């Protein structure tokens, strides 16, 4: 089977998911993707470029797989009639209805509606966790209340009926070659390996660390994770306060070095306010870190 995998947001967990699918699927995965350029622009502007990229795809496509950042109706109209009759599957890494907003920023319903239309256009929706699916289905009727005239709720059941849960695959074998190094630690090593962004709630993470430090508890830190977004000031303050106890600071490009860091950590922490299936936390657990995560 030839599967065209469309990813307008080729970064982080989206990137890991697609690369894992390419590597391990028994089907022929044909990826077209765009690099990270901001959520709003990708949801608005991705379809024109992606539709153009399909002209280079010569294979007969049996299934269309798109991510939740795709403007599916626009993509289908710009490529019509090529993909009109084949099954269309959308993988819901996240949704625009419940994703937290930065402080002082209101949710723009435009992107909820783009997400909503794309879900209606897909034949099957795959959510990354049961919590994610339930969280979205709870928020959808509240969104439909915003309609200024006739309010149609039948799409809620329609979307629910074509939704399933399938956890993203994890490529963990790449961590097996690394030897466990945590026995060499003089102090407990606490790991942060998620995005440096507000929805990961770094303020709470460092607030707890500061309290531990205030009562003279000693620990070392590995502060890794994706840093291409705007860096919260908490990380710079942490460098000033804990510099000599920070064994790594910043994104890790090299896979071997990343594996070495995870195999030297004792505890991995998430304080995220918005998370459905954190690949980074799973990787750290696989490498032997004890998880402290939200309920």
PLM feature spans:
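Active-site proximal beta-strand in glycosyltransferases
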Residues: 64, 81-101, 115-120, 124-128, ...
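Donor nucleotide-sugar binding/catalytic pocket of nucleotide-sugar-dependent glycosyltransferases
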Residues: 121-178
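Conserved donor-binding/catalytic core segment of Leloir-type glycosyltransferases
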Residues: 167-171, 181-213, 221-222
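Nucleotide-activated donor-binding/catalytic signature segment of Leloir-type glycosyltransferases, i.e.
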Residues: 225, 233-256, 267
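Short alpha-helical segment that forms part of, or immediately flanks, the ligand-binding pocket
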Residues: 259, 277, 282-286
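Short alpha-helical donor nucleotide-sugar binding micro-motif in glycosyltransferases
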Residues: 260-265
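Aromatic "clamp/platform" in nucleotide-sugar-dependent glycosyltransferases that forms part
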Residues: 273
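Short hydrophobic beta-strand element within catalytic cores of glycosyltransferases
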Residues: 290-294
């Amino acid at each position: 089977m030839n599967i065209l995998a469309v990813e307008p947001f080729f970064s982080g967990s989206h990137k890991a998911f697609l690369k894992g699918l390419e590597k391990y699927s028994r089907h022929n995965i044909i990826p077209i993707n765009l690099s990270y350029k901001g959520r709003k622009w990708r949801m608005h502007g991705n379809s024109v470029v992606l539709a153009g990229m399909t002209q280079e795809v010569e294979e007969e496509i049996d299934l269309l797989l798109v991510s939740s950042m795709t403007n599916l109706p626009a993509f289908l109209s710009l490529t019509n009639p090529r993909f009109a009759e084949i099954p269309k599957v959308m993988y819901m890494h996240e949704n625009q209805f419940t994703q937290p907003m930065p402080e002082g920023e209101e949710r723009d319903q435009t992107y909820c509606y783009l997400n909503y239309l794309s879900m209606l256009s897909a034949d099957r929706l795959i959510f990354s966790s049961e919590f994610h699916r339930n969280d979205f289905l709870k928020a959808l009727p509240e969104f439909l209340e915003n309609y200024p005239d006739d309010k149609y709720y039948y799409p809620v059941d329609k979307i629910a009926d074509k939704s399933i849960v399938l956890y993203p695959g994890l490529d963990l074998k790449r961590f097996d070659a690394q030897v466990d190094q945590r026995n060499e630690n003089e102090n407990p090593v606490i790991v942060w390996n998620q995005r440096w962004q507000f929805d990961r709630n770094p303020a709470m993470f460092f607030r707890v660390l500061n309290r531990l430090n205030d009562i003279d508890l000693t620990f070392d830190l590995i502060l890794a994770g994706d840093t291409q977004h705007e860096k919260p000031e908490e990380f710079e303050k942490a460098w000033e306060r804990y510099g000599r106890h920070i064994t790594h600071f910043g994104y890790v490009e090299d896979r071997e070095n990343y594996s070495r860091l995870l195999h030297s950590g004792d505890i991995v922490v998430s304080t995220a306010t918005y998370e459905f299936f954190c690949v980074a936390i799973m990787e750290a657990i696989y490498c032997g870190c004890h998880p402290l995560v939200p309920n």
